[in-house]
Swiss-Prot record:
Complex formation: Homodimer. Heterotetramer of two MnmE and two MnmG subunits.
Task of the protein: NAD-binding protein involved in the addition of a carboxymethylaminomethyl (cmnm) group at the wobble position (U34) of certain tRNAs, forming tRNA-cmnm(5)s(2)U34.
Name of the gene this protein is made from: mnmG
Residues at which FAD binds: G15, A16, G17, H18, A19, G20, I127, S182, Q373
Subcellular location: Cytoplasm
Domain of life of the source: Bacteria
Residues involved in NAD(+) binding: 276-290
Protein name: tRNA uridine 5-carboxymethylaminomethyl modification enzyme MnmG
Record-linked Pfam families: GIDA, GIDA_C_1st, SAM_GIDA_C
Record keywords, A-Z: Cytoplasm, FAD, Flavoprotein, NAD, tRNA processing
UniProt record, GO biological process: tRNA methylation; tRNA wobble uridine modification
Keyword Membrane: no
UniProt-listed PANTHER family: GLUCOSE INHIBITED DIVISION PROTEIN A, PROTEIN MTO1 HOMOLOG, MITOCHONDRIAL
Chief place where the protein resides: cytoplasm
The organism of origin for this protein: Streptococcus pyogenes serotype M4 (strain MGAS10750)
Length: 632
């Protein structure tokens, strides 16, 4: 079929949420003429649920996005109202940053960034169809009948695909925050042959700040110590005038109200059909599943400096409006609170992610990429990370360059994508530190060391950032080398000082680096014995040095595991492999292989239901028959 296109682009991104913004900024910065199409310009990078960025594992993803040259970290550093490092009492592998956002300012700042970006056109329009010829994308069709040509299309529609809002017995077609739903595009994706799933998520009510009795709650302040998501942000710019959050709890009265109205709860009455998030359940679900718990935490989170809206984190619900009011008034500090918005549930279509490659391109259609909640994830950070990778790979495909695949040992983003494309997901997927087997090398403090060079190679890291990174890396390397070369000897003067500080004396000579491996010896103590570095070191470099030195043995073990797995990751499986021709593999393994069509032995080994014997048989088969190369 011959199409008459009115406009021509290299890449078209459908949807301007957190995934779409990162995808379109990446493609345009890599030199591709890009269209970012959105149903509503006023909802670009909008936060329809929680007014925060980061958190456990998620905060590390934001640092990874920043290291690769993405935008989320820089944007939240300009628009936060509170910053807090989580898990400071635990090991470095699980520490992560979390920021309360001024949600309207966050969206405004991101919109400004998109509007001034070269090669990027921003358009309010609804895309109804993705145009495909001979198995590859050629463009899109708008609801107004316009046809735009494209060499690649990235679908980042969030919860808008056949979205339906549910509040008590009320159910109506809608995207998030009462925006338009994308119904025709949902039909089109199904017609193209993609398998579609149905998920559900929800949001809590918002209450008026001036109607809260804060004396009945516990204050939750931000950190005084400067921290940032972007490696380019300066400590001097750290916000001193932060806004606190507040902690309160449900109680037995709250639980009674919910239990007495379960028959009116869409979750239990059969109105809700979609699968909800395991790690962010509704309050009614929590009360039923954890009936033995006397109370549940609720955090009162301001939505910005210039609004009275307060987000009641932990109270996600789709109960009827009158029940929500009673529930709020049963909670300490909220007895007289004014509900400004009701909570609601939203059901939406997703593209089942086992149909994707690790580049986030669909296996079925060349040039069609999907990212974010469209792939079954939850969270702004997970969406942004996928959007960045999908955008990068869309640009690389258009330019005829090698694709970018982040491995599980490279980044949490790599862990997430591998989980999605290898295991799929039966519920909204959330990143957790426990999902990463190499989490000690995927830390908050070393994301730039892991990923900045990759960002530079693909063209997203500019000269200013690259120069700053090179200075930091050289300072780190030089100081590590110095500490490993200077020796402390067990002489009287040294041991007298060691004992004065309350530490065990030295029995043998050791390097300053070995001295720092002692749990009680920090960098400042070590250099008090051996002298300071040739130049003043930033606190972040010192933190990195301490972690790398104190956990060196564990880090080395993790890197050894990575090296072993690398051999399996490099063993490719031909795209044209005949799974039925492999004798002796288990029926379940054969079925899973056919469904997922893994690209490497490493990926095949991580598929649920596949055992080591199946992998051994597969490797023997490939050594004898696997001569073909995978092509897309």
């Amino acid at each position: 079929m011959t199409h008459e296109f009115t406009e021509n682009y290299d890449v078209i991104v459908i949807g301007a949420g957190h995934a779409g913004v990162e995808a379109s900024l990446a493609t345009s910065r890599m030199g591709c003429k890009t269209l970012l199409a959105t149903i509503n310009l006023d909802m670009l990078a909008f936060m329809p649920c929680n007014p925060s960025i980061g958190g456990s594992a998620k905060g590390i993803v934001v640092r990874e996005i920043d290291a690769l040259g993405g935008e989320m970290g820089k944007n939240i550093d300009k628009t936060y109202i509170q910053m807090k490092m989580l898990n400071t009492g635990k090991g470095p592998a699980v520490r992560a940053l979390r920021a309360q956002a001024d949600k309207s300012l966050y969206a405004r700042e991101m919109k400004h960034t998109v509007e001034k970006q070269a090669n990027l056109t921003l358009r309010q329009t609804m895309i109804d169809d993705i145009l495909v010829e001979d198995g590859r994308v050629v463009g899109v069709l708008t609801a107004t009948g316009q046809k735009f040509a494209a060499k690649a299309v990235v679908v980042t529609t969030g919860t808008a695909l056949r979205g339906e809002i549910i509040l008590g017995e009320l159910k109506y077609s809608s995207g998030p925050n009462n925006s338009l739903a994308s119904v025709t595009l949902a039909d089109n994706l199904k017609k193209l042959g993609l398998e579609i799933g149905r998920f559900k998520t929800g949001t809590p009510p918002r209450v008026k700040a001036s109607s809260i009795n804060y004396d009945q709650t516990e204050i939750q302040p931000g950190d005084d110590k400067p921290n940032h998501f972007s490696f380019m942000s300066k400590d001097a710019d750290y916000l001193k005038d932060q806004i606190p959050c507040w902690l309160t709890y449900t109680n037995q009265t709250s639980h009674d109200i919910i239990n007495q109205n379960l028959y009116r709860a869409p979750m239990f009455s059969g109105i809700v059909k979609g699968v909800g998030p395991r790690y962010c359940p509704s309050i009614e679900d929590k009360i039923v599943r954890f009936a033995d718990k006397e109370r549940h935490q609720l955090f009162l989170e301001p939505e910005g400096r210039d609004t009275e809206e307060v987000y009641v984190q932990g109270l996600s619900t789709s109960l009827p409006e009158d029940v929500q009011k009673d529930l709020i008034h049963s909670i300490k500090g909220l007895e007289k609170a004014e509900m400004m918005r009701t909570g609601y549930a939203i059901e939406y279509d997703i593209v089942l992610p086992h149909q994707l490659r690790a580049t986030l391109e669909t296996k079925l259609i060349s040039g069609l990429f999907t990212a974010g909640q469209t792939n079954g994830t939850s969270g702004y950070e997970e969406a942004a990370g996928q959007g960045l990778i999908a955008g990068i790979n869309a640009a690389l495909k258009v330019q005829g360059k090698p694709e970018l695949i982040l491995k599980r040992s490279d980044a949490y983003i790599g862990v997430m994508i591998d989980d999605l494309v290898t295991k799929g997901t039966l519920e909204p997927y959330r990143l957790l530190t426990s999902r990463a087997e190499y989490r000690l090398i995927l830390r908050h403090d070393n994301a730039d060391m892991r990923l900045t060079e990759i960002g530079r190679d693909i063209g997203l890291v500019d000269d200013e950032r690259w120069k700053a990174f090179e200075i930091k890396k050289n300072q780190f390397d030089n100081e590590l080398k110095r500490l490993n070369s200077i020796k402390l000897k067990p002489v009287k003067a040294t041991n007298d000082r060691v004992q004065e500080l309350g530490f065990k004396p030295l029995t043998d000579a050791m390097t300053a680096k070995e001295f720092m491996r002692r749990p009680e010896i920090d960098y400042a103590t070590a250099v008090s014995f051996v002298g300071p570095a040739a130049e003043d070191l930033d606190a972040k470099i010192i933190e990195l040095l301490e972690t790398e030195i104190k956990y060196e043995g564990y880090i080395r073990k993790a890197l050894d595991q990575v090296a072993k797995m690398k051999r399996m990751e490099e063993k490719r499986i031909p795209a044209n492999i005949d799974w039925d021709a492999i004798d002796s593999i288990a029926t379940e393994a054969r079925q899973k292989f056919k469904k997922i069509n893994p690209e490497t032995i490493g990926q095949a080994s991580r598929i649920s239901g596949v055992n080591p014997a199946d992998i051994s048989i597969l490797m023997i088969y490939l050594e004898g028959n696997g001569k073909a190369h995978r092509k897309y």
